A protein has these predicted regions:
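N-terminal basic, low-complexity leaders that serve as flexible interaction/assembly modules and, when applicable
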Residues: 1-68, 72, 371-372
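Flexible C-terminal active-site loop/helix
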Residues: 2-18, 30, 35, 305-373
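Conserved, mostly hydrophobic/aromatic
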Residues: 3, 38, 45, 74, ...
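Metal- or metallocofactor-binding catalytic centers and their adjacent structured scaffolds
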Residues: 41-123
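Hydrophobic faces of well-ordered beta-strands that scaffold small-molecule active sites
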Residues: 50, 140-146, 169-171, 197-201, ...
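Predominant activation on well-ordered alpha-helical scaffold segments within soluble catalytic domains
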Residues: 71-75, 109, 113, 117-118, ...
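Metal-dependent enolase-superfamily TIM-barrel catalytic cores that perform enediolate-based chemistry
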Residues: 130-244
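Shared catalytic-loop signature of beta/alpha-barrel
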Residues: 215, 221, 232-247, 254-350
């Protein structure tokens, strides 16, 4: 039951659109979605897959850093390790690359974590959700991401999303003038009446701006505002909670369990956006979910424009914890082609938890070779 081999395959997946953040476009179409795929094999020939898909303008990791970290430091530390000792695997990885307020190179470590979970669940013949020990739901609803420069474009995206079956819309704000951000959210609300709509500031506002925006969104009937202020500004996060009736969800600030514990102690958090790759994989993501639920915090689901491996891992986790609001797993909106042998099961923008062992997906290794960098 030992890990025998770990291989890393840097790939580029073609994209059909790019996402704009307050710092600018997350990548270019030519750059594509660049991923370090991880194939983990045990002594009996069982295989698990993971992926590191960093967004260099969102996180501190890149494809190059993930590939080097895995090949040179993390993978060698795990060769010969017991596949059922996940905590021990993270302890070894944290010795090689130190953790702090976050797990330290969490996207790279998360790729190995997901591969390890996929492998051990395949050995057991159970889906990942069964390993997590809860089946609060068998599916999760997907949200349509709206990244638009004008209200007209935002309305068009929302109407198209409704026609495709989406009932939730996350609107990117924080990189326009305040009045334009209000117009963008209003346009989506009007174009998609009855849908669940929330703005995501991606840390783009000062405290004073965030308070004004929160009050404007309140008047429109919005109920949740995601990461309006910088993740390091604990004072602003706490102040905003008392200044607004909106639920303030923290995304970038939910980077690791030690920091979240400190935010809870300071009464500066009431909701967390869970990203599997952001926190170092399933092992830490499930701990963060348990911590949040025990502290009375609301959970929302999100991702990093995940390709199918990250998408599947997130669906298993979010369904296990019963996240019922639409989740921002937007990889399929942006990635034109992937490496799966057959598509992930999605019906009317609801992602269903696969019944097959592990992540429940099959990797087409001929496609991995075709997309290789």
């Amino acid at each position: 039951m030992k890990i025998e081999r770990i291989e890393v395959f840097p790939v580029r997946l073609p994209m059909k659109a790019v996402l704009t953040l307050p710092r600018g476009p997350s990548r270019t179409l030519d750059e594509g979605k660049r991923i370090a795929l991880v194939k983990m094999t045990d002594a009996e020939g069982n295989v698990g897959w993971g992926e590191a898909g960093p967004s260099r303008r969102w996180s501190a990791e890149t494809l190059e850093s993930c590939t080097t970290s895995i090949r040179e430091y993390l993978a060698p530390a795990l060769i010969g390790h017991d596949v059922f000792d996940i905590a021990g695997a993270h302890a070894k990885m944290n010795i090689e690359l130190a953790s702090g307020l976050d797990p330290g190179q969490p996207i790279a470590k998360g790729a190995l974590d997901v591969a390890l979970h996929d492998l051990l669940c395949k050995r057991l013949g159970i889906p990942l959700q069964a390993w997590l020990g809860a089946k609060r739901a068998g599916s999760v609803k997907l949200a349509r991401l709206v990244s638009a420069g004008t209200p007209e474009e935002a309305a068009r995206i929302a109407k198209q999303g409704l026609a495709e079956g989406f009932q939730g819309f996350k609107v990117k704000v924080g990189h326009h003038k305040e009045a334009r951000d209000v117009e963008l959210v209003r346009a989506v609300l009007e174009a998609a009446p009855g849908a669940y709509v929330w703005p995501d500031g991606n840390q783009g506002y000062t405290l004073e701006e965030a308070i004004r925006m929160a009050r404007a969104f309140e008047r429109m009937g919005v109920t949740l505002f995601e990461q309006p202020v910088p993740m390091t500004d604990v004072y602003a996060m706490k102040k905003l909670l008392s200044a607004s009736s909106l639920t303030i969800a923290l995304d970038e600030a939910a980077m690791g369990i030690p920091y979240v514990i400190e935010l809870i102690r300071r009464e500066a958090v009431e909701s967390l956006a869970i990203k599997v790759s952001k926190v170092g994989g399933i092992h830490y993501a499930r701990q963060m979910c348990d911590l949040a639920l025990n502290a009375g915090l609301k959970l929302i689901g999100s991702g990093l424009m995940d390709a199918p491996i990250g998408f599947a891992a997130s669906v298993h986790l979010f369904a296990a914890y019963g996240i019922d609001d639409p989740v921002d797993l937007n990889g399929p909106q942006f990635i034109a082609e992937d490496y799966l042998a057959k598509p992930f099961p999605v019906e009317r923008q609801t992602a269903c938890v696969p019944d097959a062992p592990g992540l429940g997906i099959q990797i087409d290794e001929s496609k991995v070779k075709r997309f290789a960098l």
